[in-house]
UniProtKB/Swiss-Prot annotation:
Single biological process term from Gene Ontology: peptidoglycan biosynthetic process
Function: Cell wall formation. Synthesis of cross-linked peptidoglycan from the lipid intermediates. The enzyme has a penicillin-insensitive transglycosylase N-terminal domain (formation of linear glycan strands) and a penicillin-sensitive transpeptidase C-terminal domain (cross-linking of the peptide subunits).
UniProt EC number: 2.4.99.28, 3.4.16.4
GO molecular function, one term: peptidoglycan glycosyltransferase activity
Taxonomic lineage of the native organism: Bacteria, Bacillati, Bacillota, Clostridia, Eubacteriales
Extent of Low complexity compositional bias: 791-817
Alphabetical list of Gene3D superfamilies matching this protein: Biosynthetic peptidoglycan transglycosylase-like, DD-peptidase/beta-lactamase superfamily
Protease recorded as keyword: yes
Transmembrane segment boundaries: 19-39
Region of interest (Disordered), ranges: 755-827
Protein name, as recorded: Penicillin-binding protein 1A
Length: 827
């Protein structure tokens, strides 16, 4: 009986055992299948991805020197493994993975032990859990897998770690780990952490500094020394540092003496942290860097069809190398020149210096922009870029005239540099075309009218009413077309405003970058070269992503460009509005500009090397006191002087198709003998023309008339012969209603009606006659008349001069006998 019971118990045990074995076998097979499925869905191991770290893009100047870095919320500076101190390597291994050099990606012993500890803690309902990830696993997690917490991710992490150990050496794995790990604050990697905490390179860290950094990854926020908790209780991070040091001692990486000294240093507060600074979003050269980055973004979108998110990720994390056109040396000098311009009558408001100023200098031959300065003095991050932002446009004033008025007229052949105009108030028949109310009637600045002038002189003196008359002559549509060719932003309001197109009172405005590109046309055979802010963009593998071409378009004929270029020497001459722009012996051309109420002051110009534009004004568009457009010309000259150091003298070459001819500067027509006898001196000069535009008509403004030289009235039959004198005058067939500066040279309209001579004159004439009677009576009476100083001897001299002038093939372009007003502050 007893034997039967024992037999039954034995059979039952076997059955139960078999059942459990079967269950475990099935469970094992099932678990293995699940694990296999998890492994199968793991992403493929990309070793290059593991060794590649998210890095912000770097900008370099035109010499390949570091210039700026794209701002991100986190900073990473990749460091070469050989530059990491051995103490830091040993510290990480000791505290994070002490069997690192023995396992093959997964530490089975540690993994098993941690599982048992965590299960025990769970049973005890303890929240204290331990991790078992090796350095290799942490690297996989940081570079390949997501931060998801799941069994599946853990299995894939272990599998990929084993695979990675087959591909990389221990040094490569440890080096990649130290460059990828988050170390608190905004530091990614050990180099960024060294800069953040100790303001030094990782290679210069001490033992206790190495131990501190190695202790941070367990809980970066807890061990962050700048947190309020750590400031109140430094033992939080000090105890962690001591733990790392003990593990280094325990693993034989440091000696007992090293350990003791390190503890002593900690107790002596030798673990000194750098002064914390708030993460700055200000770039070192943000005036230039931000527009350059925007141009890169635009080109990435155009060439690769990337969306904004892809472009942002590429710039922030892609480690691109952006080679800009900026010259760091000249950028710094330009900034300093603008900052230190003592003649700008400066004052401060809310911490910002005023008036503000901005400048752009570019090589108009290849489009490379060398300098962008968007403001002067200390500026907050991402402040107004007054030089290059399309959100900060200002009216150009008279600096627009060479673009929309003078070059447009010459290129369209509707006027020449010699074409004559009358500088006088706008006639009502013209004014009514551009006003729904009272006729449009702009004034000159200052309120002076010169009378007869030609196009060249009108530009030199920046005569407003002539600019308006010329735009009326060529037509608003023609002016608009040229404005758009030059890249000037024209809105609907400007299209119907002659003030916008002739005087630069643009509704929105322009900026120095736009104007520097536009003025480059005059020195570049009429070709507009689009501004280029970078030359190349390279990805982290060295592949060239972008290499922009030089984009050009034809705006003017070479002939019109050269003639306008030559005319632009007028405004920088002593008789012009901006002679302060000149420097050295360099050939300078340019134009001042002032918008209404002195709110915006400009100088835009070029040399045979560079084009540049300078703006001065206040951010609130208020009147600028004590500063003029001539000040902008001076600032332009001071800046450009630095750009031309050691550059040889050079000229813009005249196209062979530009011809010359002698013309009358008053009428703009071919000269007559009277042109040489203008009472102010000869008005004949040699002018440049586009072939086929030389005038064919003769001067009809100069007229000759006989006058009573005593009264200045037209001579009549009542005028004594000895008072009759032949003189040359200007003809004007109407009254302009205001006084013109050439009015004194006009043909008189009053006729001499005779009358007695003044007593003194009668006496003198009587004495003269008596003396003549006493002389040889056989002499010719006409010869005696020649001796009388009241006779017309100056006419004979003028005739002699006329003969000389007729033999002169190229009279001087600027007549030094003319009386010029000092218009340095005039537009």
């Amino acid at each position: 009986m007893g034997k039967k019971k024992k037999k039954r118990k034995s059979s039952a045990f076997k059955i139960i055992l078999n059942v459990f074995l079967s269950i475990f076998l099935v469970a094992g097979v099932a678990f293995g299948g699940i694990v296999f499925a998890m492994i199968k869905t793991a992403p493929p191991l990309n070793v290059q991805q593991v060794l590649t770290f998210d890095e912000p893009s770097i900008l370099y100047d035109d010499k390949g020197q570091y210039m700026d870095k794209v701002i991100t919320n986190e900073q990473r500076i990749v460091v070469d493994y050989k530059n990491v101190p051995q103490n830091l390597k040993n510290a990480f291994v000791s505290i994070e993975d002490e069997r690192f050099y023995k396992h093959h990606g997964v530490d089975i012993k540690r993994f098993t032990g941690v599982i048992l500890i965590n299960v025990t803690n769970k049973i005890k309902r303890s929240s204290k859990l331990q991790g078992a990830s090796t350095l290799t696993q942490q690297l996989i997690k940081n570079t390949v897998l997501s931060s998801e917490v799941s069994i599946k991710r853990k299995v894939q992490e272990m599998y990929l770690s084993i695979q990675l150990e087959k591909e990389l050496s221990k040094d490569e794995i440890l080096g990649a780990y130290m460059n990828s790990i988050f170390l608190g604050g905004n530091a990614l990697g050990v180099e960024a952490a060294s800069k953040q905490y100790f303001n030094k390179s990782v290679k210069d860290l001490s033992l206790i500094e190495c131990a501190f950094i190695a202790g941070v990854p367990q809980s970066p926020s807890v061990y962050y020394p700048y947190s309020s908790a750590s400031k109140k209780n430094p033992s939080i991070y000090l105890n962690r540092t001591k733990t790392v040091l003990y593990k280094m001692l325990d693993n034989g990486y440091i000696t007992q003496n090293d350990y003791n000294k390190a503890l002593k240093d900690l107790d002596s507060k030798k673990l000194a942290f750098a002064k914390p600074s708030a993460p700055s979003n200000k770039l070192a050269y943000e005036w230039f860097s931000i527009p350059a980055i925007e141009q890169v973004k635009k080109d990435l979108k155009t060439q690769y069809k990337y969306d904004d998110k892809q472009i942002h990720n590429l710039l922030v994390n892609g480690g691109l190398k952006i080679y800009t056109t900026m010259n760091k040396n000249l950028q710094d000098k330009t900034q300093n020149t603008i900052n230190d311009a003592y003649y700008l009558n400066s004052y401060k408001s809310n911490g910002i210096i005023y008036p503000q100023a901005s400048a752009v200098i570019m090589d108009y031959h290849n489009g490379e922009v060398k300098t962008i300065v968007g403001g002067r003095g200390d500026q907050p991050a991402r402040s107004y870029n007054r030089a290059a932002s399309y959100n900060y446009l200002r009216p150009a004033g008279s600096s627009i005239k060479p673009l929309t008025v003078y070059s447009a007229a010459i290129d369209s052949k509707k006027a020449t540099a010699a074409t004559g105009f009358e500088d006088s108030p706008i006639p009502n028949n013209i004014g009514r075309k551009y006003s729904s109310g009272a006729p449009y009637n702009p004034r000159n600045t200052p309120d002076i009218y010169y009378g007869y002038v030609n196009v060249r002189e009108a530009l030199m003196r920046s005569i407003n009413v002539v600019a308006v008359k010329l735009v009326d002559k060529i037509g608003l549509n023609t002016s608009i077309q040229y404005a758009e060719k030059f890249g000037i932003p024209i809105d609907q309001h400007d299209r119907s405003s002659i003030a916008s197109l002739s005087l630069g009172e643009l509704h929105k405005g322009t900026n120095p970058l736009i104007m520097a590109q536009a003025y480059g046309v005059f020195g570049n055979n009429g070709t507009y070269t689009e501004a280029k802010l970078y030359t190349k963009v390279v990805d982290r593998t060295g592949k060239v992503l972008l290499e922009p071409k030089t984009n050009t378009k034809k705006v003017l004929s070479p002939e019109a460009a050269f003639i306008t270029y030559d005319m632009l020497q007028g405004p920088v001459s002593e008789s012009g509005t901006g002679p302060q722009a000149n420097f050295g012996n360099m050939e300078v051309r340019g134009k001042t500009g002032t918008s209404s109420d002195m709110k915006n002051l400009w100088f835009c110009g070029l040399t045979p090397y560079y084009s540049a534009a300078v703006w001065i004004g206040n951010d609130n568009s208020s009147t600028v006191d004590g500063v003029y457009s001539s000040t902008a010309a001076r600032l332009w000259g001071d800046i450009m002087k630095e750009f031309h150091v050691n550059l040889p003298y050079k000229q813009v070459q005249k196209p062979a198709s530009v011809v010359t001819a002698n013309v009358d500067r008053i009428s703009g027509k071919l000269p007559t003998q009277l042109s040489y006898r203008d009472p102010r001196g000869s008005t004949v000069y040699n002018e440049f023309f586009i072939n086929g535009t030389i005038p064919t008509e003769y001067d009809d403004i100069h007229v000759e008339a006989q006058i009573n030289k005593l009264t200045g009235k037209l001579a009549s039959k009542f005028t004594p012969s000895f008072l009759v004198e032949s003189r040359v005058f200007l003809r004007r067939d109407y009254s302009p209603g205001v006084e013109l500066l050439d009015q004194q040279w006009l043909l008189p309209y009053s006729i001499d009606e005779g009358g007695s001579l003044p007593p003194t004159e009668e006496k003198n004439n009587s004495n003269t006659r008596d003396k003549n009677k006493d002389k040889n009576k056989d002499k010719d009476k006409n010869k005696n008349k020649d001796k009388n100083p009241s006779q017309d001897k100056p006419n004979n001299n003028n005739n002699n001069n006329n003969n000389d002038n007729n033999n002169n093939t190229k009279p001087p372009e600027n007549d030094s006998n003319q009386n010029h007003e000092d218009n340095k502050n005039k537009q």
